[in-house]
Amino acid sequence: STSAAPAPMGMSPAQMQKGGGSDEMMKAMKSGMDGMQKMQISGDTDKDFAMLMKMHHQQALEMAKLEIAHGESPELKAMARKIIKDQTKEIAQLDAWMKKHP
């Protein structure tokens, strides 16, 4: 008979299963934070705002997609879908502004 590996102390196997999305979310957050820290600041507040906000929104999109894929709350999944819709539009607006102000 084969048995699953024991869950870490304090976690049920079901919680471990659910945690997959959380692990991915933390990796996405760390990647985004690392990217923002490596970004070259121009000294132009408007340009820096646009670049940092775009990166911030891209992280939000990644997290929202993970919520939709792994989350269980209908309320949070609905919020994640709204975030994807709204912030995708805002990224396009930021891109358009940056294109006009190279």
Residue ranges and their predicted role:
Residues 1-102:
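His/Met- and acidic-residue-enriched segments that coordinate or traffic transition-metal cofactors
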